[in-house]
Amino acid sequence: MSKDLEVAGRYANALFQVAQDKDLVDVFSEELTELKAALNANKDFVKLLENPTFTTEQKKNLASAVFEKINPTLRDFIYLLIDRSREDYLSVIADVYQKRVNDLNGVADADVYSVVPLSEQELTALSRVFAAKMNKTKLNIQNHIDKSLLGGVKVVIGTRIYDDSLKTKLKDMERQIKA
């Protein structure tokens, strides 16, 4: 694990603990998702927030103006990050926090690769089958198009890969023939 991810993980875990204590886990999850989307959409704001020539107070005033509608506890957390010069971790913290929420709710993220876009019915069926395999209640599936698979699907959930693509089957046959 990289040092940055480790640091972000500590902050995310602390925020998650506070959210659980205050029964705000879902509120923080929604607000962090919106906050991350806003940061990704506005790179100039991120540059200002991470600018070392700005004082801590100037950064807090900027954050206060932009994040005025978020939960006060979450806003205080952002101020804490600014105080400790960790504002550049905010996006990663949001990701780690969401992973903790997903773990709590029995949800996992899955990337499904296919040659053509899968229908809602196919995605639902894949979600049901692989959620059961992973002991999860639900999978958030992201469908990616990969023409090199030739056919079939490849499902990636965390570090696990389930590859039922024609490309892999052909490679397996090639290895068997050469052996």
Curated annotation (Swiss-Prot):
Main location: membrane
Record InterPro entries: ATP_synth_OSCP/delta_N_sf, ATPase_OSCP/dsu
Keywords: ATP synthesis, Cell membrane, CF(1), Hydrogen ion transport, Ion transport, Membrane, Transport
Name of the protein: ATP synthase subunit delta
Entry's localization field: Cell membrane
Topology within the bilayer: Peripheral membrane protein
Functional summary from the UniProt entry: F(1)F(0) ATP synthase produces ATP from ADP in the presence of a proton or sodium gradient. F-type ATPases consist of two structural domains, F(1) containing the extramembraneous catalytic core and F(0) containing the membrane proton channel, linked together by a central stalk and a peripheral stalk. During catalysis, ATP synthesis in the catalytic domain of F(1) is coupled via a rotary mechanism of the central stalk subunits to proton translocation.
Gene name, Swiss-Prot/TrEMBL: atpH
Entry-linked Pfam families: OSCP
Claim: Transport is one of the keywords in the record: yes
Gene3D superfamilies for this protein: N-terminal domain of the delta subunit of the F1F0-ATP synthase
One of the record's GO molecular function terms: proton-transporting ATP synthase activity, rotational mechanism
Protein origin, superkingdom: Bacteria
UniProt similarity note: Belongs to the ATPase delta chain family.
Subunit-level organization: F-type ATPases have 2 components, F(1) - the catalytic core - and F(0) - the membrane proton channel. F(1) has five subunits: alpha(3), beta(3), gamma(1), delta(1), epsilon(1). F(0) has three main subunits: a(1), b(2) and c(10-14). The alpha and beta chains form an alternating ring which encloses part of the gamma chain. F(1) is attached to F(0) by a central stalk formed by the gamma and epsilon chains, while a peripheral stalk is formed by the delta and b chains.
GO cellular component: plasma membrane; proton-transporting ATP synthase complex
